């Protein structure tokens, strides 16, 4: 049963006419017994047999046997009238396990959205078309949102989640579609499908919300920003809407609903510095369903509707960076000034009193004779061996020069000339030598004298023992002394 285009039987005929001629080819037709047009018969062109097939599915439970009457004639009518040949065909229907059938195949149920979990919705069952009693079990094949549950024995459908009519992902035109299965315990088991269509009725479960939720406004002569109000619910749970500012947002902002009640104008009523602020806007619909929405408002330093915001990074971060850069630059300038000033003020390499060039020495002579000053005789004999103290300087880069080798003072007086020339060359390359271009060498008078010859004057206890005539040879600067002492005896 339930098989379409199934070959039931082949009918064979005998014809003495020439094979494959029109007088030989047979034509078959069913003349009785097929009230439901379940069968059809055609001719095999090769064997000239009649092929009986089903063109509809046979139902064992409706009819177990079909008796058909088949007639056969030639394509070419007989020349003389002859009786036609007929055959009786009995078709027995074989019973097979048929799937359960839901009644009706598609079931429409109206139910209110938002019902509680576990609340019953409907019972959706199927019948078994077979004559034998078989047990049928039920389960859900496709439930996109997972909102339903089905009892496997009774087929009772209950709510397993919150049914939301406004869920556009799963609900189309207020209808939520679910597919269920019914399976029997036959051999082999068969399954039937059914469709459950839930028409969700609206309740006031959504509050109104404004769009957009981000605005930009000037803090000088601000232009009100219009926000459209939307509500997913159906009338009468929609407009007119009401607006109210909460969380102290009404201190700086105002919210007014238009005449139609489907939009709200948000405006700044007090000056605010540039920045981002949260405005708490509460909207309620005609059914007093309230919804709080936080509007993100960007306030700019501008006028009217010329909304332009400078990048806050420029002033919030650039100014401190510039200040730090200027402070660093000022510090560098101060350090540079101190370094240059330190370079200009240098300590003299020799104290002024140490410079004995072109100076007249006063020996404190008061008439009775000169008082010898205390000199370090050992320094006069050391000559070039008396090396000056090294002066540290920070205005020039250090250079590495090998220390010159000075020749020791010879014992032979005849070698004193070579001694001076060689040590002069060494002193010219000595970085520790005094910064003078001449070598100071005192006249050496021999080792027998305890005092070097500082002058030709000899010590005496009286002015009469001294001769001052040599002062006339010293020039005009000593003329007065020459007059005072040179001619004193004649007076």
Curated annotation (Swiss-Prot):
Which parts of the chain does the record assign to the membrane side Extracellular? 1-316
Q: Which residues are glycosylated?
A: 228
Cellular component (GO) terms are: adherens junction; catenin complex; cytoplasm
Q: Does the keyword Calcium apply?
A: yes
Question: In which domain of life is the source organism classified?
Answer: Eukaryota
| Cytoplasmic side of membrane | 340-491
Give compartment(s). Answer: Cell membrane
Against Gene3D superfamilies, the record matches this protein to: Cadherins, TCF3-CBD (Catenin binding domain)
Q: Which GO terms describe its molecular function?
A: beta-catenin binding; cadherin binding; calcium ion binding
Keyword set, alphabetical order: Calcium, Cell adhesion, Cell membrane, Glycoprotein, Membrane, Metal-binding, Repeat, Transmembrane, Transmembrane helix
Topology versus the membrane: Single-pass type I membrane protein
Query: What is one GO biological process annotated to this record?
Result: cell-cell adhesion mediated by cadherin
CDD domains, per the entry: Cadherin_repeat
Q: What is its main location?
A: membrane
- Which positions carry the signal peptide feature in this UniProt record? none
The Cadherin domain covers 1-102, 103-208, 209-314
**Membrane-spanning intervals of the chain:** 317-339
The protein's matches in PANTHER family, at most eight in alphabetical order, are given as: CADHERIN-23 (PTHR24027), CADHERIN-3 (PTHR24027:SF446)
Q: What is known of its domains?
A: Three calcium ions are usually bound at the interface of each cadherin domain and rigidify the connections, imparting a strong curvature to the full-length ectodomain.
Assembly notes: Interacts with CDCP1 and CTNNB1.
Instruction: Name the job this protein performs.
Output: Cadherins are calcium-dependent cell adhesion proteins. They preferentially interact with themselves in a homophilic manner in connecting cells; cadherins may thus contribute to the sorting of heterogeneous cell types.
Report what the protein is called: Cadherin-3
From what organism does this protein derive? Bos taurus (Bovine)
> Which gene name does the record give?
CDH3
